[in-house]
Curated annotation (Swiss-Prot):
A Pfam match: Anticodon_2
UniProt similarity note: Belongs to the class-I aminoacyl-tRNA synthetase family. Glutamate--tRNA ligase type 1 subfamily.
Motif interval(s): 'KMSKS' region: 259-263
Gene3D superfamilies linked: 1.10.10.350, HUPs (3.40.50.620)
Subunit and interaction comment: Monomer.
Compartments (UniProt record): Cytoplasm
Catalytic activity line of the entry: tRNA(Glu) + L-glutamate + ATP = L-glutamyl-tRNA(Glu) + AMP + diphosphate
GO molecular function, one term: ATP binding
Name by which UniProt lists this protein: Glutamate--tRNA ligase
Coiled-coil portions: none
Length: 502
């Protein structure tokens, strides 16, 4: 393998959504391949036809591409090692299985599901680790089953599977890039089914053959596959192939350190996309679930290119990684704060136009959908929103008249003379020829100070009548963005609708 071009792969099953753990696996494979100037391959492992979901393959690849994880070779992009869908490679697996049968590394097994379950229960009662009892291992391979009976079953067309013959009394050893040396006793390894009765290979068999034929140099996958490694290494040995280097990633855990699962929250990448998370934040987040740049490094926000430049498998830890939603939310806010106005506009404007189709506004459409107006809203609100869609959904008063006024805020901020003060302040605003935040603030101070009042007696009521809520960005800047005509109209409407709470 010395001098071999680095080639990694992500091999999902088309059984549904892309799990965040799957995204991390794909990302680490992609980052390592790109860092080493190698190739990243996507292969679809659909050997379990009963679990196949229509459209899942396309959705998986679409989600990966949304995240910026683009394959060099895949079902969509092709390549010299295809097909890249396992169900289209059945003749390849059959050929290699025949070779193992001829070399006495595999054998036919006619055990029924009932027999297998009975044997499993018996072993459990005896306190043994369940594994196949080798009833159908032929005499010529050290078993007790006569070859004549096996031929008779085959000629009768009875259903069978093909199992690998695990050598007795040996140790299977390998070096994991993340975990170091690992050793398994062959006594703990089951005679794995290689070919199922439907003619499809199992994952274990197909993945080994495909990884070799596709010239995969490094296998980077989740810790849950660690126990399968000795079976795979034996298959490489049976074929006389050199095994790829391997790295098994740490588990993803809930905050209570239980394994991340749908029972405790969203685990599908699509769920987070629907909630409004950006690809940059999600990729950044999953990259940090197990990897860090090193001691003393305080950087937490990384672009995909920065991750590519700095990633290394040696900096991936062994311990389980805690999936903390607060960290993802924090990252999303960092990206919004630092994203260019132009990029935010490209997202916010279509969202607003869509909202205006559902709910017309009395504000001039040309004004509130203009780049200059939306840019002002974005600059004012980018520190306060958590998602791009909140520039519309969390900031509705920039586009629509308040339909109501927050009762708690009115109760807290309204005084017996509030309506009178607001009405008297209208002429001060009308007199402003240049409706800027600075001029609005100066006018308010000039209005309240002679009365011996604090600014707050007007600031809070003004916010309520112009936005409908008791919180938000700088009042003066908000009023400037809304514009003189809108502000005056909303004050007058508020005076009609709000009275001193009882």
């Amino acid at each position: 393998m010395v001098g071999q071009r680095v080639r990694t792969r992500f091999a999902p099953s088309p059984t549904g959504y892309l799990h965040v753990g799957g995204l991390r696996t794909a990302l680490y494979n992609f980052l390592f391949a790109k860092k080493m100037k190698g190739d990243f391959i996507i292969r679809i492992e659909d050997t379990d036809q009963s679990r196949k979901v229509e459209g899942a393959q396309q959705n998986l690849i679409k989600t990966l591409e949304w995240a910026g994880i683009i394959a060099d070779e895949s079902p969509q992009h092709g390549g010299s090692c295809g097909p890249y869908i396992q169900s289209e490679r059945l003749d390849i697996y059959a050929k290699h299985c025949k070779q193992l049968l001829e070399d006495h590394h595999a054998y036919y097994c006619f055990a029924t599901p009932e027999e297998l379950e009975e044997n499993r229960q018996l072993q459990l009662k005896q306190g043994l680790q369940p594994k196949y009892n080798r009833k159908w291992l032929p005499e010529e391979m050290g078993g007790t089953m006569p070859e004549s009976l096996i031929r008779q079953k085959l000629e009768a067309g009875e259903p069978y599977v093909i199992r690998m013959k695990v050598p007795d009394y040996i140790s299977v050893w390998f070096e994991d890039i993340i975990r170091g040396p690992i050793e398994f006793d062959s006594a703990t390894i089951d005679d794995q089914v290689l070919m199922k009765s439907d003619g499809f290979p199992t994952y274990h068999f197909a993945s080994v053959i495909d990884d070799h034929l596709m010239e995969i140099s490094h296998i980077i996958r989740g810790e849950e596959w660690l126990s399968s490694m000795p079976k795979h290494l034996l298959l490489y040995e049976f074929f006389g192939w050199e095994a790829p280097k391997v790295a098994h990633l740490p588990l993803l855990l809930n905050p209570d350190r239980s394994k991340l699962s749908k029972r405790q929250g969203d685990v599908a990448v699509e769920d987070y996309i629907r909630k409004g998370y950006s690809s940059e934040a999600i990729v950044n987040f999953v990259a940090l679930l197990g990897w860090n740049e090193g001691e003393g490094c305080e950087q937490e926000v990384y672009s995909l290119q920065e991750l590519t430049d700095k990633f290394s498998l040696e900096r991936v830890g062994k311990a389980g990684s805690i999936f903390t939603l607060d960290k993802l939310k924090w990252l999303e806010k960092q990206y919004i704060k630092n994203r260019s106005v132009e990029k935010l506009l490209s997202v916010v404007k279509p969202l607003l136009l869509e909202e205006l189709e559902k709910k017309p506004s009395i504000m001039a459409r040309e004004q509130i959908t203009s780049d200059s107006y939306l840019s002002s809203v974005i600059e004012l609100m980018r520190e306060r929103v958590g998602f791009e869609h909140e520039f519309v959904t969390f900031s509705t008063y920039f586009y629509f008249e308040p339909e109501s006024y927050d009762e708690e805020s009115v109760k807290k901020r309204w005084q017996p003379n509030t309506n009178e003060l607001l009405a008297d302040f209208i002429p001060q605003l009308e007199a402003l020829s240049d409706f800027t935040a600075e001029n609005i603030e100066a006018a308010l101070k000039a209005f309240v100070e002679p009365k011996g009042m604090k600014n707050a007696v007007l600031i809070h009521p003004l916010r309520i009548v112009t936005s409908g809520v008791g919180f938000g960005p700088s009042l003066y800047h908000m009023l400037e963005v809304l514009g003189k005509e809108t502000v005056l109209r909303r004050i007058r409407k508020g005076l009609e609708c709000i009275t001193m709470p009882a």
